[in-house]
Swiss-Prot record:
It comes from the Archaea. Belongs to the eukaryotic ribosomal protein eL14 family. This is Large ribosomal subunit protein eL14. Gene3D superfamilies: 2.30.30.30. Keywords: Ribonucleoprotein, Ribosomal protein. Signal peptide: none annotated. The keyword Glycosyltransferase does not apply. The lineage of its organism: Archaea, Thermoproteota, Thermoprotei, Sulfolobales, Sulfolobaceae. GO terms for molecular function: RNA binding; structural constituent of ribosome. One of its GO terms (biological process) is ribosomal large subunit biogenesis. InterPro entries: KOW, Rib_uL2_dom2, Ribosomal_eL14, Ribosomal_eL14_arc, Translation_prot_SH3-like_sf. GO terms for cellular component: cytosolic large ribosomal subunit.
């Protein structure tokens, strides 16, 4: 089970959206992925994110590569994960 894969739900650990959950929509290269909230669910915009700034969860939805926000929202509703996505989490950031 790869931790970084399309459809994996992750928690953002850095930036203004830290603590919010997102879904991996596409893998850009070995360092970056494309994620979305979707924005109308938990205010996480579709953007490129460094994988070091993500903490994968054990939850995954079945979406196609490059799925639209509407498709992601529909799959989240089918899986019953809308309320899970709206809950913020305190990210585990190691102290340097």
């Amino acid at each position: 089970m790869p931790a970084i894969e399309i459809g994996r739900i992750c928690v953002k650990t850095r930036g203004r959206e830290a603590g919010k959950k997102c879904v991996i929509v596409d893998i850009i290269d070995e360092n970056f992925v494309l994620v979305t909230g979707p924005k109308d669910v938990n205010k996480v915009k579709r953007r490129r994110v460094n994988i070091l700034h993500l903490e994968p969860t054990d939850k995954k939805i079945d979406i196609n590569k490059g799925a639209s926000d509407d498709e992601v929202k529909k799959k989240l509703e089918e899986a019953g994960l809308i309320e899970f996505m709206k809950q913020d989490v305190k990210p585990k950031i190691p102290v340097i």
